[in-house]
């Protein structure tokens, strides 16, 4: 019963009441298994009521570790997944505000404000934080943050160009973004790609770099979104997507001779993709 009093106070974000209920619980049941977790949550709530002072670079990682490794597990264990995530959001928001002045550091990217805003559930603030990073569209971490924020704020259609660029730039980061989003369509399309496309002569190229080109073969209706991806490093996967977009245009226009020549170029670029394309014809 006293544990429930602590939990109720925590959910109300009443730090004083939580502290009093926790003290009563400790007095009556000093070996209660939830004491350590409840103490962690009460302390976190008390600290969140203090002024949110900017983080110095040396403070950033310890502050993130405290919230990520101690407070968050305690909240999920004691409050449950739904209430726990909702309870944690203001704490992530406070940490994001404190990290706002920290520059992007590729070696410590997790302590930038953008991923903290994502964890707080503020997609617009996450986008704004990413836009403050120079050349963010050429760096895997901020490109992934922007793709996630854009998808959550505006839907998957708005994020397709960013996801394409991420596939070309850093396949593992794309996989991480897809896992974080939990979008059924995105997960299904990635799974289908893994199940159906043989890398063929291009085993040295990261497999997910070919996903955008395969995606256009499998889902040609996505062409208006995929073609908005910005030019990258002119890699073979990027050239293949552009070529497939050209092929779809030639088909619509009935330009047979040019279509045959473009198909030959596709076959030379990636035989397995060419075979997948021809199967759909």
Task: List where the protein language model places each region.
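Generic helix N-cap/helix-start motif at coil->alpha-helix transitions
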Residues: 1-3, 31, 63-74, 102-111, ...
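Conserved small-residue packing positions in alpha-helical repeats and bundles
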Residues: 5-9, 35, 39-40, 47, ...
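Helix-turn-helix repeat elements of alpha-solenoid scaffolds
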Residues: 10-19, 47-48, 64-65, 76-94, ...
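Short, charge-rich amphipathic alpha-helical segments embedded
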Residues: 15-51, 135-144, 148
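Structural signature of alpha-solenoid helical repeat scaffolds
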Residues: 27, 55, 59, 101-102, ...
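Charged, helix-prone or intrinsically disordered regulatory segments positioned adjacent to compact structured domains
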Residues: 42-86, 163, 179-184
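Eukaryotic alpha-helical solenoid repeat scaffolds
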Residues: 86-127, 146, 152-281
């Amino acid at each position: 019963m006293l544990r429930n009093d602590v939990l109720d106070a925590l959910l109300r974000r009443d730090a004083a009441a939580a502290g009093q209920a926790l003290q009563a619980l400790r007095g009556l049941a000093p070996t209660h298994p939830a004491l350590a977790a409840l103490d962690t949550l009460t302390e976190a709530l008390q600290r969140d009521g203090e002024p949110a002072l900017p983080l110095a670079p040396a403070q950033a990682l310890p502050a993130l570790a405290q919230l990520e490794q101690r407070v968050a597990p305690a909240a999920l264990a004691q409050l449950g997944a739904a209430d726990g995530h909702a309870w944690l959001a203001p704490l992530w928001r406070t940490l994001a505000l404190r990290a706002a002045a920290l520059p992007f550091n590729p070696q410590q990217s997790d302590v930038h404000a953008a991923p903290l805003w994502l964890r707080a559930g503020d997609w617009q603030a996450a986008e704004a934080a990413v836009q403050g990073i120079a050349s963010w569209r050429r760096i895997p971490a901020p490109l992934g943050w922007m793709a996630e924020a854009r998808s959550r704020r505006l839907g998957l259609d708005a994020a397709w160009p960013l996801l394409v660029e991420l596939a070309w730039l850093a396949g593992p980061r794309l996989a991480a973004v897809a896992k974080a989003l939990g979008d059924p369509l995105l997960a299904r399309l990635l799974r289908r790609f893994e199940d159906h496309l043989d890398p063929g002569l291009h085993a040295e190229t990261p497999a997910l770099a070919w996903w955008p080109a395969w995606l256009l073969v499998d889902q040609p209706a996505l062409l208006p979104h995929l073609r908005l991806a910005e030019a990258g490093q002119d890699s073979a996967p990027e050239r293949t997507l552009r070529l497939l977009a050209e092929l779809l245009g030639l088909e619509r226009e009935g330009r047979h001779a040019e279509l045959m020549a473009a198909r030959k170029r596709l076959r030379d670029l990636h035989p397995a993709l060419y075979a997948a394309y021809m199967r759909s014809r």
